[in-house]
């Protein structure tokens, strides 16, 4: 796992530049898709593409507890390697309103079972976690945050 203070886009290689370009193109598509929405999340969407990225590799029994990304506006995940779910949501990403200090068992949860190559965007303020998995394989992702100009690292 890349330490969070090391931004993979800070001194990019040619491959990282290609990856960043893919993300930026997907962000453009995302913005166009929702541009007519009246919610403040879209209306105040950052116009500058300040991306902060890192990698995560989880092994068997790997998971991430529910968390948010407080300095980001939008967070994203690119799935480089996924794990088979075995019908139990293993390796899925779960979105909810539940976090360390915000637990409500009745709050809605949304599970997404990723496939290799998927890119997933979500508000950085939305709690998310990785469902633990039992298969003897790795789950490898590139995570990133779109940082508003005032919050740039």
Residue spans for each PLM region:
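Proline-centered turn/helix-capping motifs that create local helix->coil transitions or kinks
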Residues: 32-35, 83-88
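Short, conserved beta-strand element in jelly-roll/cupin
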Residues: 56-60, 68-86, 97-99, 145
